[in-house]
Amino acid sequence: THEKLGIGFQSLFPVLSVVDPELMRSVPPRLTAYQGLDTFFHLAEGYLSKKANYFNEMFSITGIEKIGAYLARAVIEGNDLEARENVAFANTLGGFVMSTGKLLSQHSLEHILSAYHPNLPHGAGLILISRAYFGFFIDKGLCRQKFIDMARALGNKNASEPQDFLSALDKLLEDCGVSNLTMSEFGIKAEELPAMAKEVIESLAPA
């Protein structure tokens, strides 16, 4: 159907969750990068959202700091338990951010990509569109201070311009070995894009 819709309902929340980084040691490097960057984009979208609040902004920035400091380590050395633990913690914070606020349209756009191409990993799809997506906001002069905040959280303590966020994102992608992904390697064709854009507007934007 070329649709990939998100759902949310109170009954989907577990009574108890056990997040055990020991179980994550064997996750392959590429999948670790994809899933860790999905976490990062949950945190970033939640931080930029109009629904952000003091409560989940705290979770967002803390989670982004953890991703900036530990994700590449977890990708490079899967048995680095300290790195696994901190990435898992960031992922948990991302869940708190989503459940107390709202994400932006980056996820909606990616859902269409992977609806058309089910073999496209969700995290990879987010990576493919991330620079253009956040660059659009920066070019429009939106959320200037928040982009600077996120650049600093990623490790650039001297960040002073929103563009520094894109540089920090580029470094994170490079450090995780996923900076050179292309749409064509996942079978995405330019002629599909108009239909995908229409699908986003019709099936996802109203939600």
Segments from the language model and where they lie:
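Short runs of predominantly hydrophobic/aromatic residues within well-ordered alpha helices
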Residues: A33-G36, R84, L126, L193
